[in-house]
């Protein structure tokens, strides 16, 4: 009985010092990925900022953040995304 209690204490101590890989600062990529694009242009007055998704994502995308803090995925190949969305935010 004493051996199993000691073994349990050692395992518990070892588990306390183990950290998951996701807790590492090198693995903390929190950039969202997109799985569908917006089908129509957004009004420019609704846009506050934008960012690109990570290269680790399966679909490249521009994520527009609206004034209400909603994140909307858009196709970076679309003309309205480049010319109206991104350019208008860069001008401000």
Swiss-Prot record:
GO terms for biological process: antimicrobial humoral immune response mediated by antimicrobial peptide; chemokine-mediated signaling pathway; eosinophil chemotaxis; G protein-coupled receptor signaling pathway; inflammatory response; positive regulation of cell migration; regulation of insulin secretion. Keywords: Chemotaxis, Cytokine, Disulfide bond, Inflammatory response, Secreted, Signal. SUPFAM superfamilies: Interleukin 8-like chemokines. Pfam families: IL8. InterPro entries: Chemokine_b/g/d (IPR039809), Chemokine_CC_CS (IPR000827), Chemokine_IL8-like_dom (IPR001811), Interleukin_8-like_sf (IPR036048). Gene3D superfamilies: 2.40.50.40. It is found in: Secreted. Residues 1-23 form the signal peptide. It comes from the Eukaryota. Disulfide bonds join 33-57, 34-73. One of its GO terms (cellular component) is extracellular space. Chemoattractant for blood monocytes, memory T-helper cells and eosinophils. Causes the release of histamine from basophils and activates eosinophils. May activate several chemokine receptors including CCR1, CCR3, CCR4 and CCR5. May also be an agonist of the G protein-coupled receptor GPR75. Together with GPR75, may play a role in neuron survival through activation of a downstream signaling pathway involving the PI3, Akt and MAP kinases. By activating GPR75 may also play a role in insulin secretion by islet cells. This is C-C motif chemokine 5.
